[in-house]
């Protein structure tokens, strides 16, 4: 299995990960790039590529070993299916939307993965979170405070993409990275 072809995309809430992943999904031309959806115990809002599971469904799948990666965040469970291992073994570049807090555990399973951190200026994050309408003002402030405290773990090389500007600008950077990995 070629874990260096696993691309773990993460960033603070409001950085635009889902928008960038949707952009990349639409614009990549390399057929060997696969975008894994997540399994989440949260209703889909239409802006994120995920499979909605009940807590019981998630727990059953976790117990059966159906997840390559799984974590909890903000009261929800998240998982990425073991199908990504077959995709990696077949030579695909596999893109997953991950969690910064779960990065150390993900690196234990896939130590050679490519880590991509999407970020945006604090005022852009705040504006996007408010527009999204999922959290109260206090919850938004707490999310922004966590964003400031996060630091790259020692020894992790990552690609940083600033998504403060246009989606097209940041999207082209992500697409170029993915297509470069697929050609290597």
UniProtKB/Swiss-Prot annotation:
Enzyme type, top EC level: transferase
EC number assigned by the record: 2.7.4.23
Family: Belongs to the ribose 1,5-bisphosphokinase family.
Gene name in the database record: phnN
Source species, domain of life: Bacteria
Organism: Burkholderia pseudomallei (strain K96243)
Pfam families hit by this protein: AAA_18
Pathway entry: Metabolic intermediate biosynthesis; 5-phospho-alpha-D-ribose 1-diphosphate biosynthesis; 5-phospho-alpha-D-ribose 1-diphosphate from D-ribose 5-phosphate (route II): step 3/3
SMART domains on file: GuKc
Protein name according to UniProt: Ribose 1,5-bisphosphate phosphokinase PhnN
Keywords noted in UniProt: ATP-binding, Nucleotide-binding, Transferase
Catalytic activity: alpha-D-ribose 1,5-bisphosphate + ATP = 5-phospho-alpha-D-ribose 1-diphosphate + ADP
UniProt: ATP binding residues: 11-18
Record-level Gene Ontology MF annotations: ATP binding; ribose 1,5-bisphosphate phosphokinase activity
Function, as annotated: Catalyzes the phosphorylation of ribose 1,5-bisphosphate to 5-phospho-D-ribosyl alpha-1-diphosphate (PRPP).
Lineage: Bacteria, Pseudomonadati, Pseudomonadota, Betaproteobacteria, Burkholderiales
BP-aspect Gene Ontology terms: 5-phosphoribose 1-diphosphate biosynthetic process; organic phosphonate metabolic process
